[in-house]
Amino acid sequence: GNVDLIREAIDAVPVDPSGLERMCEAVIATVVDHRDYVKNRQMAIILVTDESGERKTNNAMLEQAINTAKSVGCRIYVLGREAIFGYPYTYMRWRHPQTGDVHWLQVDRGPETAFVEQLQTNGFRRRRDAFSSGFGPYEQCRMSVETNGIFFMLPTVEVDQVNGQADKRRYELEAMRPYLPDLSSRFEQLGLRGELPMRTLIWQVITDLNPWREDVRDVTEVRMSFSINAQQFVAQAREEQQNCIIYLRYLARAQKMMEEAYELRTKETSRRWQANYDLIYAQIVGYQARIYEYGAALEALSLIHI
């Protein structure tokens, strides 16, 4: 083909000022707009993206995008980024061109699974890490697999991503094979979850401790900045200590639920879900120590200001 013509076509694509990544909608529109050209030829889409797409439209339109592509035998090849481990977002450094201020912009970048399988908190607040999952985003991998395409993971390290190269890991393919994410449909996985009590429990624990939920955010996100006024500081510290008590009860209850379900863990056939159990249990225990020390530090500082 004419490479220059292809480049011109790419350069002619207008910039979308909305900032939204309507990936599934774009796939559907592309197939529909070009399906009349498919006669005795193999249709293929090459999807190049550094995000995982809008979560709302991904949830609603992924299967429609797959079925639309299948209807004309269109294969989907994706050049994309590695998903964040068990988390929908990452944060990218952006320097304001006028002020020079650095801002951390939230970007959709995962997870590698149909539903999050890890805690969304780091113990103090919602996660802001960039731990590598070893796999591509669920939607992009599923589209590729279901249409007999391929997901190609871009290999370069993103220096502007939060933590830079500190959280970048390279995994051996064979070592990761037992931990491959389930790429079946969300509907199928939801039904299977209802039949497997341990997976249901893990989902409940993740949901109960999710700082993205507005109804639990006041408890699962602790205060990280305080007034420099001594009286106001003490009042804020006392309020946070009360929240810590509630949070510790949350965590203790979750730990007890996980311990009571250990027998289910021994019967679980998926190595990935066994690992999910182990990691979440360890985090719950560790977070209790973290919150206890946080409360103790507030107490020590309060005594200084009284």
What does each model-identified segment do?
Residues 51-142:
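VWA/integrin I-like adhesion module and closely mimicked acidic/polar interface patches used
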Residues 1, 47-51, 79-82, 154-157:
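Active-site-proximal beta-strand/loop segments in catalytic clefts of secreted hydrolases
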Residues 305-306:
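Conserved small/polar residues in nucleotide/adenosyl-binding loops
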Residues 101-245, 249-250, 256-270:
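C-terminal "exit" segments of structured domains
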Residues 272, 277-279:
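Residue signature of alpha-solenoid helical repeat architecture, marking inter-repeat boundaries
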Residues 4-43, 53-56, 80-89:
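Von Willebrand factor
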Residues 39-44, 70-77, 147-150:
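Loop/turn elements at helix/coil->beta-strand transitions in domains of secreted/extracellular proteins
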